Amino acid sequence: MGLSMIKYLLVMKICSSLYGNCMPEQTMDHFNTWYECSRQGTVNTLATIDILGEKELNTNRLYVTFTCREINTT
């Protein structure tokens, strides 16, 4: 049997505090460390905010969240 390695899956979603709902989660990349995953989640969050734009964010009170989920790989 192969050795099991822990990796981290970056999962992001866009939510609206105005409407109280979120779009479906989007799985992104796999990372070897928590640091790499959380850093990329922050970078992706800022990029998503820039893409959506100030007007869209303000109108719908949008915010972007992310989490790093631990996964076992072989």
Which ranges hold each PLM region?
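Intrinsically disordered, low-complexity regions
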Residues: 2-4, 72-73
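Short, intrinsically disordered, charge-biased short linear motifs at domain edges
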Residues: 6, 22-26, 52-58
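A short, exposed loop/beta-hairpin motif centered on an aromatic-Gly-Thr core
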Residues: 22-36
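Short, mixed-charge low-complexity intrinsically disordered segments
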Residues: 43-74
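Hydrophobic alpha-helical targeting segments used for export or membrane insertion
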Residues: 4-18
